[in-house]
Design a protein with these regions (language model features):
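Two-component/phosphorelay signaling modules centered on CheY-like receiver
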Residues: 12-31
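Short hydrophobic/Thr-rich beta-strand motif most characteristic of the beta2 strand and flanking loop
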Residues: 26-34, 42, 192
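Acidic catalytic/metal-coordinating carboxylates
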Residues: 35-38, 59-64
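Short amphipathic alpha-helix used as the core "switch/output" element in two-component signaling
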Residues: 41, 63-75
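Active-site beta3 strand of CheY-like receiver
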Residues: 46-52
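Active-site residues of response regulator receiver
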Residues: 54, 82
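Short, flexible helix-to-coil linker/hinge segments that flank and couple to helix-turn-helix
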Residues: 88-154, 196, 207-209
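Recognition helix of helix-turn-helix DNA-binding domains
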Residues: 164-197
Length: 210
């Protein structure tokens, strides 16, 4: 039976292109999402075999969306589609339970191979990132340690996207006081004291696009 696929990318033209590519290879696309939170909701409702998540999506980045997908639909395998090939991004994704890490610079067939591999419960890395991950495990590179918790990273992304504390509280389902507490704590951890600094940090971490 053909794997059932959920696509998540904030660019409609990208989703349309990916759908055409996958359907041409006999794969079934059962849903599309334009942001990370919609992707999580659809994964919980549709229970796809594979969720393909763009790393830099609005409201919730692909990495944190993958964690939520795993929580709501444990059988769903996740693939991150990204421009980031540095070892610390790959390691962080693997630690989050992502099954596939596909670089956007690779040929289209790379994504199709990734889908088939993760459906066999294997881990798939694009060739362009494989060397970085091998070097990191051999001790030739030191992965960047993410100082923030998953929730703090979500708050960082929303702050960088221009959301108010009240809007952040609503999106996360917490009180305004709790949202403000998360913001204060992440600023203290990062030693950043203004919103502009948080935006720059979020861009460097790939949570939002410049």
């Amino acid at each position: 039976m053909s794997p059932r696929i959920l696509l998540a990318d904030d660019h409609l033209i990208v989703r349309q292109g990916l759908r055409a590519l996958l359907e041409r290879d006999g794969l079934e696309v059962i849903g599309e999402a334009a942001d990370g939170r919609e992707a999580v909701r659809l994964a919980g409702e549709l229970r796809p075999d594979v969720a393909i998540l763009d790393f830099a999506m609005p409201l919730l980045n692909g990495l944190d969306a993958a964690k939520e997908v795993h929580r709501l639909s444990p059988a769903t395998r996740t693939i991150l589609l990204t421009m980031h090939t540095e070892d610390h991004y790959v390691l962080e994704a693997l630690q989050a339970g992502v099954s596939g890490y596909v670089a956007k610079t690779q040929a289209a067939g790379d994504l199709v191979r990734a889908i088939h591999e993760v459906c066999r419960k294997a881990i798939y890395l694009s060739p362009v990132v494989s060397r970085a991950i091998v070097d990191a495990y051999r001790g030739k590179a030191t992965p960047q340690v993410d100082l923030l918790s998953s929730r703090e990273r979500q708050v960082l992304q929303l702050v960088a996207e221009g959301k108010t504390t009240k809007e952040i509280a609503t999106l996360l389902g917490v009180s305004v006081k709790t949202a403000e507490s998360h913001r204060t704590r992440l600023m203290r951890k990062l030693e950043i004291h203004d919103t502009a600094g948080l935006v720059r940090y979020a861009i460097r971490r790939g949570l939002i696009q410049p």
